[in-house]
Amino acid sequence: DNGIVASASLVADDGASSTGGINTDTGNDVTTLTLGYNGDGWGGGLVLASNDGDVGTVGYDAFGLGLNYSPESIPATISVAYDTKDPEGTANDETDLFIGVDYEVGPGTLHAAWNTTEVDGGSDNLDISGFEVSYSYSINDGVTITPGFFTVDDGEGEEDTGVVVETAFSF
């Protein structure tokens, strides 16, 4: 469906506790606002989030922007997302960039994505990057299989690599 999509939420981490509460100075609260638009062949969204950090955790403000485009000339979707996180106090800011492509190949879709996170003010070993590749295809009307692999560089020269097989059922 095309059109505007929006949401707002308030999550109280300590809402179940009588000493924490909801939206109080004795509990942590996270407020999130989203606004997006879906059009023919494209879409985008904006996310604003804030953690007040009142108790035990560092508060932060976060901003995210994402766009996707599906050109009519090729069977693909290109997605780009940019996110920032600004913690209170002396904690280091984070910037994240994601680029993904979905391309119809044969009976399924090939997915490829790259992501990098840069931690400002910290050492380079806090920066991480990685990529993933997968292929999804339907086994029948209700089952989709998606095998894939990923690798993530932790910034210290170590890589975590894995193989994944997801099976999705629809009834």
Which residues does each PLM region occupy?
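Outer-membrane beta-barrel proteins
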Residues: 1-171
